[in-house]
């Protein structure tokens, strides 16, 4: 079970092609987000146009009428998005009062030269078209601050862009750009640069001239290096380099003293420069899916604001050197899929804010003696290790809500597990358990209990006390019977009894589980139920239990 928080830079956060990036990007410019709120039918003193939601499919002459209306009303905003425009009539040059022009989601392959006469334009939205170039006349737009060219067919950054010195926000995501020219250094006012999802192999050294740059998003490209000059971008707070081919970071990264977030996951990085410890404002350290074998000593200790640490899918064999102090402010730790064999005693003794710990897919053979001190943890994932014993001190994790221990070598559970009063999910699949302790019945908030693929022979009668249980998975065990108390599970929705070769009957009380929606009985003989009934599947089996059992009247009256 995943316990790590998704890094906000990840594209999974942007499900709509027209959705603007979040965080500071959204604060820098929200015009793309709002474009769908306006329609041609809206009347206002400062806007005209539409987002296409009303089925607007006007011929050229009607488009000219919109220009005329806009000019007559001296509207400063014109939205002609989603109306399948293939070209812009030249009379647009007369709309010199415009400060915002939106042409999103059309079929434009080029822009007219006349657009350069809109000298008051501050925002120009052109995303989701088929543009391959821009007219040189755009250099005349000396007031332009925001240019959105996402989702076009650009193979290079149009040279005219480098001449628009007033630009503060430049979106070029989802194009086919292979390079960024040294002339990018001319854009001295640029605060946000988004070139994600292109084919860029290298950033120019002139990137260092962008001293006003606050957000730089370069993920999903083919970068093999980052220039040392990036360290001169001293205003940077967000640097996204995820999903590239980087093998190292420049030492100058330490000069980015205002950096709050750096995205370097899914690269080929083998070491982190110790200079990163100078980035005292960093709040997240996410280096998932690289080739790290260790971190610089005390690196995390020197970053006091770190609340999220994700070192998953690397080649670590031990915890980072830095002792308990390195996790003082940490809320989430994800170190899954490494080669860690030991959790140092006391490593979390100062982690009073730690709520989520994921050590899935490592080589742990035991848990530390002070495990009981992890009292703040709410989610603990220790699946796919080599654990043979769960310490009795597990009961001290009083805030635990999710416990994942699947795919280990556990032979028994401590009775103290029943003291985890807040536990909602317990995953014990693929272990070597032969019994489930009676104390399991004390877990009144448990909604999910997975114990499939063990060696369980019987269940305790206390299973019927799990009043919140919704998902019970008992498949692939050695069960010989199901306790009649299962009928008390009023919230049960899913029940898996498959692949229990010694299970020959089901209790009539199962018919009392009125919330049951899914039941699996494949490869369980159920020989004491007529074969023509079992052949009909779980639904018919439940009907049989209703009709044949002593609770027939109760069940029928509740229908």
From Swiss-Prot:
Keywords: Leucine-rich repeat, Repeat. InterPro entries: Leu-rich_rpt, Leu-rich_rpt_typical-subtyp, LRR-SigEffector_domain, LRR_dom_sf, LRR_R13L4/SHOC2-like. GO terms for biological process: fibroblast growth factor receptor signaling pathway; intracellular signal transduction; muscle organ development; positive regulation of Ras protein signal transduction; regulation of cell projection organization; vulval development. Residues 1-55 are annotated as: Disordered. Residues 1-17 have a biased composition (Basic and acidic residues). PROSITE patterns: LRR. The keyword Repeat applies. GO terms for molecular function: small GTPase binding; volume-sensitive anion channel activity. LRR repeats lie at residues 74-95, 97-118, 120-142, 143-164, 166-187, 189-210, 212-233, 235-256, 258-279, 281-302, 305-326, 329-350, 353-374, 376-397, 399-420, 422-443, 445-466, 468-489, 491-513, 515-536. Belongs to the SHOC2 family. Acts as a Ras effector and participates in MAPK pathway activation. Probably acts as a scaffolding protein in a protein phosphatase complex that specifically dephosphorylates Raf kinase and stimulates Raf activity at specialized signaling complexes upon Ras activation. Required for vulval development. Involved in fluid homeostasis. Plays a role in nicotinic acetylcholine receptor (nAChR)-mediated sensitivity to nicotine. Interacts with let-60. PANTHER family: LEUCINE-RICH REPEAT AND IQ DOMAIN-CONTAINING PROTEIN 4, LEUCINE-RICH REPEAT-CONTAINING. This is Leucine-rich repeat protein soc-2. It comes from Caenorhabditis elegans. The gene is soc-2.
